Amino acid sequence: MSDPLALAQALLRCPSVTPLDAGAQSVLAEALTAQGFTVTQLPFGDIANFYAKRVGPRSGPHLCFAGHTDVVPPGDAPWSVDAFAGEVHDGVLIGRGACDMKGAIASFVAACAARPDHPGTISLLITGDEEGVATDGTVRVLDWMRQAGEIPDFCVVGEPTNPGRLGEVIKIGRRGSLNATLTVRGRQGHVAYPHRADNPLPRLVAALHALTTTRLDDGMEGFEPSSLQLTTVDVGNPATNVIPEQAQARLNIRFNPLHRGDDLARWLRGIVQDHAPDAVIDIAISGEAFVTDPDRDPRPGASHGIAALRMAIQRITGLSPRLDTGGGTSDARFITHLCPVVEFGLVGATMHQRDEAVAVRDLQDLTGIYEALLDFYLGKDSA
């Protein structure tokens, strides 16, 4: 087995806080080029991206690994070590991006190094725009891949899917996400003279009550019920004797595949306009719900890929991973439109936290899992 630690440390030492790359992708591209990968740089705007590909000596499927080299800021809370030093203490690698997700990238590259004569094709889709607005990253690379005819049979995204132990969870889908801002305007005035003012709050409150008391669905197999949550309600008015001129609320809907984002947007607009006809409604759909169901997805790569990954996890960890759809959004929501996709990476207990960390043993075991996945999926062993 190849050791991923040195590459993981080199990546952590690049302070690649979105949208900065800070040399991270150069480190990665150099490692892949040395293994015989062809690396195509695909910068869009200020974002660094690349697509790397290696074709084996024998025919076989095309397996893609997708990952991001950008990280969130280290935050204001003091770390026990430098967040970008890549230090190992007591068998634990500490640094921003250790589990989300530079460690997983290093493990996959190490797995590729251990399988230089694999059948089929291995590719990597690497972006620097996953933690940001995600407009010049994976979505743009996917457009390029379609035009270039680079269509994988199966893709694994190296997100930290495991809550506490490596091998617990494969993510086979995600809920969709809709954000909305509702603004209701009125006329400011003194509370003692309400007839001279127009209070926007009753209209906004009525709309919010109607939204939050509606049950969107009862859930479906593999997915919890869709959820609408208020995140802010604000009038910008500290005074107790002034009727505000404006009231604003923000909300998020996490929805399962029973809904499409556009349908929920129309529903939301209708409810709000029933109670606040003058409301200004801004809606952004950051991703649709999706699922790569091994029993129902008609694409042949789906069932074979999930079976191969489950066998690889069982071989290295002895665990039988559960298939799950919980959590937030990831770039898998874009990749699903190109090919079957799942997510599997490290333990995510410390992602986005102070002293983000990963056990060195987990890095090594994840490398072993990815090696076994290459064997099972590409044809060295049968899944």
From Swiss-Prot:
Disulphide-bonded residues? none
Q: Which reaction does it catalyse?
A: N-succinyl-(2S,6S)-2,6-diaminopimelate + H2O = (2S,6S)-2,6-diaminopimelate + succinate
Query: Could you tell me which InterPro entries the record lists for this protein?
Result: Bact_exopeptidase_dim_dom, DapE_proteobac, Peptidase_M20, Peptidase_M20_dimer, Peptidase_M20A
Q: What is its EC number?
A: 3.5.1.18
One GO molecular-function annotation for this sequence? Answer: cobalt ion binding
Q: Which UniProt keywords apply?
A: Amino-acid biosynthesis, Cobalt, Diaminopimelate biosynthesis, Hydrolase, Lysine biosynthesis, Metal-binding, Zinc
Instruction: Please name the catalytic residues of this protein.
Output: D70, E130 (proton acceptor)
> Which GO terms are recorded in the biological process aspect for this UniProt protein?
diaminopimelate biosynthetic process; L-arginine biosynthetic process; lysine biosynthetic process via diaminopimelate
Describe cofactor binding as the record notes it. Binds 2 Zn(2+) or Co(2+) ions per subunit.
- Which Pfam families does the UniProt entry name for this protein? M20_dimer (PF07687), Peptidase_M20 (PF01546)
The annotated pathway is: Amino-acid biosynthesis; L-lysine biosynthesis via DAP pathway; LL-2,6-diaminopimelate from (S)-tetrahydrodipicolinate (succinylase route): step 3/3
What does this protein need as cofactor? Zn(2+); Co(2+)
Q: Which domain of life is it from?
A: Bacteria
Entry's family note: Belongs to the peptidase M20A family. DapE subfamily.
Quaternary structure and partners: Homodimer.
NCBIfam families according to UniProt: dapE_proteo (TIGR01246), PRK13009.1 (NF009557)
Name of protein: Succinyl-diaminopimelate desuccinylase
Organism encoding this protein:
Granulibacter bethesdensis (strain ATCC BAA-1260 / CGDNIH1)
Q: State the gene name recorded for this protein.
A: dapE
